[in-house]
Amino acid sequence: MPKMKTHRGAAKRVKRTASGQLKRSRAFTSHLFANKSTKQKRQLRKARLVSKSDMKRVKQLLAYKK
């Protein structure tokens, strides 16, 4: 059986925090800002943590990433 590889697409989008949680950036932030409210644009700037339901799958994609 070959070794598992780190999923490079996921590795570029997620960073591990000091406590081991995974931090991700928000979607919908590249264009079409004219029809988004100021509040929505401000909230999109903040990073979020990967949800508990997705954590197992994402950790499997990032098998060797520290």
Swiss-Prot record:
Signal peptide: none
GO biological process, one term: translation
Entry keywords, A to Z: Ribonucleoprotein, Ribosomal protein
Molecular-function annotations in GO: structural constituent of ribosome
Region entry Disordered, spans: 1-49
Compositionally biased intervals (Basic residues): 1-16, 38-49
Source organism, top-level taxon: Bacteria
GO CC annotations on file: cytosolic large ribosomal subunit
Any Pfam family matching the protein: Ribosomal_L35p
Family of this protein: Belongs to the bacterial ribosomal protein bL35 family.
Protein name: Large ribosomal subunit protein bL35
Taxonomic path: Bacteria, Bacillati, Bacillota, Bacilli, Bacillales
Recorded name of the encoding gene: rpmI
